[in-house]
Amino acid sequence: MSTSLSYRDAGVDIDAGDQLVENIKPFAKRTMRPEVLGDLGGFGALVEIGKKYKNPVLVSGTDGVGTKLKLAFDWDKHDTVGIDLVAMSVNDILVQGAEPLFFLDYFACGKLDVPRATDVIKGIAQGCEESGCALIGGETAEMPGMYPVGEYDLAGFAVGVVEKENVITGRSIGAGDVVLGLASNGAHSNGYSLIRKIIERDNPDLDAEFDNGKTLREAVIAPTRLYVKPILAALEKFTIKGMAHITGGGITENVPRVLPENTVAQIDAKSWELPKLFQWLQKAGNVETQEMYRTFNCGIGMVVIVAAEDADAVQGLLGEQGETVYRLGLIRERQGDEHQTQVA
C-alpha cells in the first residue's frame, strides 16, 4: 500500500498560513475605520459608505511593486515593500480626489516563510495606517513550484470614495495655472529594472555613506512616499484642478494624463535640484537627461496643478503638512502636436 499523502507533503503548509493570519491580526486591527463591518477572516469584507456623502463615487486602483522586489530578495529587506504596495495604489486614487477607504493584498510564494511574510504584511498595515485606509483582507497563496525559493510576488487593491461633484478630472486646467511638485522619497517603485542594471554594471559599495547619513542601499530601497493626508488636507480648503502620481513613465509621461489636449505643462528643470540618488543613477548609467525624465520621478513624486491665485496658499499648506513643495512651472497653450510636458 502506498504512503498516505497530506497537503503539507505537496508543499502547502496550512498551519503556517494560519500562523501568519494570527501574526498580522493586531497590525490589521490598527488600520480599521468605522465604516468597516466585522472582523478579519470572513469570506468577504463589509464596508459601508458613510452618510456624510450625498452622491458618493467609488474610485479603485490596483498595482504592484515591480522589480524592486528583486532587491528586497537579494538584500533580505522585507519590512518596507508593503509600504510601497499601499502607496502605489492609494496615491493613484488620490489623484481623482478620493479618500482611500480600504485595501486588500495578494501575497504569492512557492513556500511560505512566516517571519518574512509577517514583515511584508506589517509594512502593508503601516502604509494603510499612515494613509487612513483599512486593511480589510487579502490572499496568501502558497504555490509549490511557481516561485523560486525565497521569492514572492505582491499585488494590492485600494478603493476610495469622493463626492461626485468633487471628482478631479483635469478638465478645468488652463493656461496660467501653476504646476507644483511634491518631493519624492527616492525612486519609489518605478525604474528598478534600470536601477538593478546600473548596480550590476557599476558594482558600487552599497553600504558606504551616500547621502545625508544614508547608504546607497538605503537610498535605493527607501519606500514610496504616501501623499494621502497632506493632499486631503489641501482639498478641504482649496480647489486642485489636477494631479499626477509620478510612476512608470516618469514626469514626462504621467503629467499629460491629466491635461486637456490643448495644454502643455512647461516645467523649469532648474526649479528643483535633482536628488543625489538620481544624479548617481544618471552618471553611473550614462543615462540621457530625457530618458531620466521618462523613466524616473527624478525627485518629484506627485504633481499638483492649481489656479495661480491659490498657488502660494496651497504650497504653504502642503509645507505645513510636512511636504517639500517646488513651484515647477506653468500651464500654457499647446503648439501643434508638441509633447504635453516640456522640461527645459
Swiss-Prot record:
Task: From the UniProt record, give one GO term of the biological process aspect.
Answer: 'de novo' IMP biosynthetic process
What pathway, per the record?
Purine metabolism; IMP biosynthesis via de novo pathway; 5-amino-1-(5-phospho-D-ribosyl)imidazole from N(2)-formyl-N(1)-(5-phospho-D-ribosyl)glycinamide: step 2/2
- Keyword Zinc carried by entry: no
Location in or out of the cell: Cytoplasm
Please list the coiled coil stretches.
none
Give the stretches traversing the membrane.
Answer: none
Keywords attached to this entry = ATP-binding, Cytoplasm, Ligase, Nucleotide-binding, Purine biosynthesis
Gene Ontology CC = cytosol
List the InterPro entries.
PurM-like_C_dom, PurM-like_C_sf, PurM-like_N, PurM-like_N_sf, PurM_cligase
Q: What class of enzyme is it?
A: ligase
Q: Which Pfam families match?
A: AIRS, AIRS_C
Official protein name in the record: Phosphoribosylformylglycinamidine cyclo-ligase
| Gene that specifies this protein | purM
